[in-house]
């Protein structure tokens, strides 16, 4: 099979590659975007801009209008970093443009106990992302429709990603009402009868016989 570009002169191939590289570099340059939005760049491995907490919603709206999508929300506790920081906490928002591949981090510096506006009204993807930051760092997002824990148990005290969270072993209490298995799965654990999962207790001991391998039993009417 002949390569599609086999008949092209080598100089043309080099020129085409150079133009493609230049266009890609230009498309990823966010300096003009920062100038349009009136943002100042901050040091970072990826293009990063500082945003005042009171300007976050307006900046996010401007980015959404330009076609940017929200990829991630990250909370950081800088309180014990050796280098001085403007505030002990920060929330970083990773946004990207799906067509020209520009990517930008917005960093909002926050003091202890300071809240920041939720971006859920602008990007629905902020829902679980902000809940995760709230759960692990305790940063609250004003205007979030359902700000509650999403990863840690409800009765866990503190926020695991804060620098003041105590290190060491935390006992896990498997008590009734905290980790509640479905009743059908519990029935399967006994080995006496199959639950809706098709699980049998013998398999738990490694006794996997051919007659034990059965398809899952579905609820009446099929999957729910």
Swiss-Prot record:
Membrane topology designation: Peripheral membrane protein
UniProt-annotated stretches for the region Disordered: 202-224
Catalytic activity: a quinone + NADH + 5 H(+)(in) = a quinol + NAD(+) + 4 H(+)(out)
Keywords: Cell membrane, Membrane, NAD, Quinone, Translocase, Transport
Extent of Basic and acidic residues compositional bias: 202-213
Keyword Cell membrane: yes
Location of this chain's protein in the cell: Cell membrane
One GO MF term: quinone binding
Keyword rRNA processing: no
Pfam families named among the record's database cross-references: Complex1_30kDa (PF00329)
Disulfide bonds: none
SUPFAM superfamilies the UniProt entry points to: Nqo5-like
Recorded GO CC terms: plasma membrane
EC number, as in UniProt: 7.1.1.-
Enzyme's top EC category: translocase
Family: Belongs to the complex I 30 kDa subunit family.
Subunit architecture: NDH-1 is composed of 15 different subunits. Subunits NuoB, C, D, E, F, and G constitute the peripheral sector of the complex.
Function summary: NDH-1 shuttles electrons from NADH, via FMN and iron-sulfur (Fe-S) centers, to quinones in the respiratory chain. The immediate electron acceptor for the enzyme in this species is believed to be a menaquinone. Couples the redox reaction to proton translocation (for every two electrons transferred, four hydrogen ions are translocated across the cytoplasmic membrane), and thus conserves the redox energy in a proton gradient.
Name the UniProt record assigns to this protein: NADH-quinone oxidoreductase subunit C
């Amino acid at each position: 099979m002949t390569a599609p570009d086999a008949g092209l002169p080598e100089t043309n191939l080099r020129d085409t590659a150079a133009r493609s590289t230049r266009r890609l570099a230009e498309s990823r340059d966010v300096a003009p975007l920062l100038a349009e939005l009136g943002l100042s760049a901050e040091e970072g491995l990826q293009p990063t801009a500082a945003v005042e907490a009171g300007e976050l919603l307006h900046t996010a709206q401007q980015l959404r209008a330009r076609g940017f999508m929200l990829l991630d929300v990250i909370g950081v506790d800088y309180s014990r970093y050796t280098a001085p920081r403007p505030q002990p906490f920060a929330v970083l928002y990773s946004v990207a443009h799906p067509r020209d591949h520009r990517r930008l981090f917005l960093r909002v510096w926050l003091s202890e106990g300071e809240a920041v506006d939720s971006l859920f009204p602008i990007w629905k993807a902020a829902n679980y992302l902000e809940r995760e930051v709230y759960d692990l760092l305790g940063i609250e997002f004003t205007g979030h429709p359902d700000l509650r824990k999403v990863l840690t148990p409800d009765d866990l005290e503190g926020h695991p990603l804060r620098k003041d969270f105590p290190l060491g072993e935390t006992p896990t209490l498997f008590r009734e009402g905290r980790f509640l298995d479905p009743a059908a799965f519990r029935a399967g654990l006994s080995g006496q009868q199959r639950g809706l999962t098709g699980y049998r207790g013998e398999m738990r001991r490694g006794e996997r016989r051919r007659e034990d391998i059965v398809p899952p039993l579905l609820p009446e009417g099929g999957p729910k």
